[in-house]
């Protein structure tokens, strides 16, 4: 039997074949473990913003088959399928409001295209969608808090007056008009985040459970 020296150990062909088999087994086990990790990764802390009509996150992940039909149906190129570096489970649809918000199509084509019900095809209206909720995260940077008069987030809101408004507040002895999000009406479309004039938007869309610490998506949209 042929043999060769590796360091101080004499390695036979049989030893080499056994080592190779063990390496393959470890690789397979590692691949299985990685796949299992991806499948069972908890989405609790995920900040992914889902398309309108999405079921609660766990139900959504169970129903979504990663087909991409919702992405193809969106006329604005809002939706993408998640890659490894994204804040969403691999292959699932999401969008980044700062890049392209949801333009709230009345016929909700993305939900209508879903073959499994991961996106609720029976959502009554786009105004019933619960993609998330806008949250004013940049109190230190929002121009209104600095005493300036900016109303862009209010003016661009597709349901202006219901989802967001300017309300008077006293800050450091000054009377200023501050953007106030009315979460019961906000759909999380992200138009306000997209149009914020700051380099880092002072207003951001977050999943409802993360933004408000309350119940998130449900099949009929938001519950008051």
Curated annotation (Swiss-Prot):
The protein's annotated pathway: One-carbon metabolism; methylamine degradation
Binding locations of [4Fe-4S] cluster 2: 102, 105, 110, 114
Binding positions for [4Fe-4S] cluster 3 per the UniProt entry: 142, 150, 153, 157
Annotated keywords: 4Fe-4S, Electron transport, Iron, Iron-sulfur, Metal-binding, Plasmid, Repeat, Signal, Transport
Molecular-function GO term, any one: 4 iron, 4 sulfur cluster binding
One family name in Pfam for this protein: Fer4_7
Domain (4Fe-4S ferredoxin-type) ranges: 54-84, 91-124, 133-169, 177-208
Residues in the signal sequence: 1-41
Keyword rRNA-binding: no
Binding site for [4Fe-4S] cluster 1: 64, 67, 70, 74
Superkingdom of origin: Bacteria
Gene3D superfamilies: 3.30.70.20
Cited function: Involved in electron transfer.
NCBIfam families noted in UniProt: mauM_napG, PRK09476.1
Protein name: Methylamine utilization ferredoxin-type protein MauM
């Amino acid at each position: 039997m042929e043999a060769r020296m590796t360091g101080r150990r004499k390695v036979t062909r049989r030893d080499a074949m056994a080592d190779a088999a063990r390496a393959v087994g470890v690789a397979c086990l590692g691949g299985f473990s990685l796949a299992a990790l991806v499948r069972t990764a908890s989405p609790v802390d995920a900040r992914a913003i889902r398309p309108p009509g999405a079921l609660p996150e766990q139900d959504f992940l169970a129903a979504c088959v990663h087909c991409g039909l919702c992405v193809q149906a969106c006329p604005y190129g809002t939706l993408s399928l998640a890659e490894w570096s994204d804040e969403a489970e691999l292959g699932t649809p999401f969008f980044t409001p700062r890049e392209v918000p949801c333009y709230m199509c009345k016929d909700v084509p993305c939900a209508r295209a879903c073959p499994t019900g991961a996106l609720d095809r029976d959502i009554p209206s786009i105004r019933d969608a619960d993609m998330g909720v806008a949250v004013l995260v940049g109190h230190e940077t929002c121009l209104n808090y600095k005493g300036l008069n900016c109303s862009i987030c209010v003016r661009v809101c597709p349901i202006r007056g219901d989802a967001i408004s300017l309300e008077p507040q006293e800050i450091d002895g000054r009377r200023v008009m501050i953007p106030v999000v009315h979460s019961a009406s906000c759909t999380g479309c992200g138009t306000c985040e997209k149009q914020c004039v700051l380099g880092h938007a002072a207003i951001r869309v977050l999943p409802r459970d993360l933004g408000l610490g309350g119940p998130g998506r449900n099949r009929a949209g938001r519950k008051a």
